[in-house]
Amino acid sequence: MTSDDIPIGRRVANWRVRRSMTQQMLADRLRRSKSWVDKIERGARTLDRYSVIQELAHVLRVDPEVLLGQQRSTPAGTTDGVDGIRAALARYDIPQAPPPTDELRRQVGHAWLTYQHAHYGQLVRLLPGLLNAAQGAWSAELLVQAYRITSSLLVKLDEADLGWLSADRAMAVAGGDPVLAATAAISVGQALRAQGQDHLALAALLPAADRVLPLSSHPDDQEVSGTFGDQTAPKPLDHRGEGDHGGGGGHRGQGDLREWAVGGTLLLQAALAAAGCGESRRADELTDRAAGVAANLRGYDDQHHTSFGPVAVEVARALVAAQRGDAAEALRRHSTTVRREGWQRLPAEYRGAHLIDVARAYLQVGDLRGAARALVDADSIAPAEVRCRPLARTVIADVARAQPAPAGVARLATLVGLTR
């Protein structure tokens, strides 16, 4: 089924879920009944007035053409070329002459750096060729990485369905390799969360984390090596995963610290999924568990490109707070996090994405100037995060509606093709 074939009511429902709104919340903002929203989403009531569609689009922060299933015009700064990635994912014929493995590894490494520096336009152009090459090389490790990069970019560009396809391909290629499967599960969880499928994301993320983390990282097994979280953590390991563990026999296996970083990332993604399900207590427990894993990492080679560590945990805590509606706590945590030394070491993509989330938190508390500062800071760190992502565009639109618009936002609105 193409986008044009999807009933308008289902598109309304999909965007409502993406905006983390219940039917009652949408009804309240439209000043209509919950029953009216339910009938629209089920197709029991026809949306045949453009003025009503415009009103819905305004509340859902999308263009009316999106709800109508019509082709959107591409605003300035938006990355195009996704069709080339779609075509590469649709290929089932194997290229006859893939590059040597060393050359492919170099290309994959370059693609990761391009993503982490938020050069999304460049990455869109690189990915079709990289996918074709990786699909012909039969290197599971490199193909999983190529699919993960692709999925991460597609989720950024609001192509979550296609992102999920790429993540699912990564999972299939990983096969029985627990570490590769765990890295692929990160992308699966991200794509499902972007689709509003938080329960499914949680179901995929937690088993994957448990397969790569030692039993001592779970709160039910604290007798092995102490209490994680904000209390006493196990003794730090070195980069080989070695350390003084007292010879305890309750571990699943200490493994490599790179695997622990993958497991910690899975826990953070699971915490965000739990928050999306409304399970705030579980989200806090999962972030505490991830904090314990992070505290046990002295330093590691981030081969799997997770950016996991204590600062990543604090970023997740802020987002969990925002998701449960406590924007004030989210902003307090953000203020503390950006003063930590590790903040500047996070990739530009990571920091830019967080600042967009921070801008949304400022909007929740009615601080338009704070939201504007966060957007301008994000643009200075990772311009494509602000200028290419549909999510950022909706935040800019919300801030730009102020009269007069805060400093810097009018310029951003113009850059992304918005008019006040």
Predicted regions and their residues:
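Short coil turns linking two alpha-helices in DNA-binding domains
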Residues: T22, S33-W36, R49, D63
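DNA major-groove recognition helix of helix-turn-helix/homeodomain DNA-binding modules
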Residues: R31, S51-V66
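Conserved hydrophobic/aromatic packing and binding residues within compact polymer-binding modules
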Residues: V12, Q23-A27, V37-I40, L67
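Conserved binding/catalytic microenvironments
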Residues: A97-P100, L104-V108, W112-R420
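Recognition helix of helix-turn-helix/homeodomain-like DNA-binding domains
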Residues: R31-L47, G69-S73
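A short, Lys/Arg-rich alpha-helix, primarily the initiator
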Residues: M1-R19
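Short C-terminal boundary/hinge segments that cap the last helix of small helical domains
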Residues: R61-A76, V313
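Short, charged recognition helix plus adjacent turn
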Residues: G69-A97
